[in-house]
Amino acid sequence: MKKRVLSSLVAGVLAIGVLAGCGSNNAEDTTAENNQANASVTETENAGDADNSTVESKGTITVAASATPHAEILEAAKSILADEGWDLQVTVFNDYVQPNEVVESGEFDANYFQHIPYLESFNEEKGTHLVNAGGIHYEPFGIYPGTKTDLADLAEGDVIAVPNDTTNEARALLLLQDNGVIKLKDGVGLEATVNDIEENPYGVEIEELEAAQVSRVAGEVAFVVLNGNYALEAGYSVSKDAIAYETADSEAAKTYVNVIAVKEGNENSEGIQALVQALKSDEIQKFINDTYDGAVIPFTE
């Protein structure tokens, strides 16, 4: 398989977001000690709605979140919770260690930024006791056109660019398998690498690149396989431009659903249950679908 090394430096929240919210299961990829000094924390305004002044107050729910799409979705849910007597307070964190630490310590009730593999890996490495209180959304991988626009036009020697980190590469390879481009060894699942390709009927080459670089070679390769965040950044519309993308019933979607995480024992508390129900409401599902054009999809199970 062909592998191109790119020297471009990648910075910004999106690069980390793919690891924590959209595809990495290695908590070691973030370092608590380094991020404590550099993380910028911005607290959004509390929801204060005069129309809800007659609603009996049930208390405050504090949530640590990443900015996009998590905090945006939470902001949309504030009025729903306010109507039920809950004051939802959202604080945006720019790293992916502190949101777990502040929930573990009890400073915050919940966080919303990560998928289950990252949560489990963080618990194992840091000795925390965080659990999934409810899956809210997933960010699908999609196959996007490069120099070709139809998978049926694939020819021997065509190159398909995929992310090179373990979990994101596995998702890309599984999506290619689901669409008949390759066949993987049985049972490799979300640990698949290019070495697990058992059949390659089109004779394509898989080019492994850092996730943030994949979209940048679209003009040089037949197809690119991208996470939803990177697709948005590159100007793609998931619903309009993706040739194929992960469906809600796919193994990847169920595994990498972004969740509300809480300290063990708090998952059934009244406030957390109200929060999860609000985020899974028809109103919030519509908000997600209308706002993110397929790059973020409500998880309904």
Each predicted region: which residue ranges?
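Sec-dependent N-terminal signal peptides of Gram-positive bacterial secreted proteins and lipoproteins
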Residues: 1-26
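Bacterial lipoprotein signal-peptidase II cleavage site
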Residues: 18-50
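Short, polar/charged alpha-helical segment
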Residues: 45, 67-89
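Short, well-ordered beta-strand elements
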Residues: 56-68, 86-92, 158-160
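Short helix-initiation/N-cap motifs at beta->coil->alpha
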Residues: 90-101, 189-216
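Ligand-binding "clamshell"
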Residues: 121-133, 146-148, 220, 225, ...
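A conserved helix-loop-strand patch within extracytoplasmic ligand-binding domains
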Residues: 133-182, 285
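A bilobed periplasmic-binding-protein/Venus flytrap-type ligand-binding module shared by bacterial periplasmic
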Residues: 140-151, 256-269
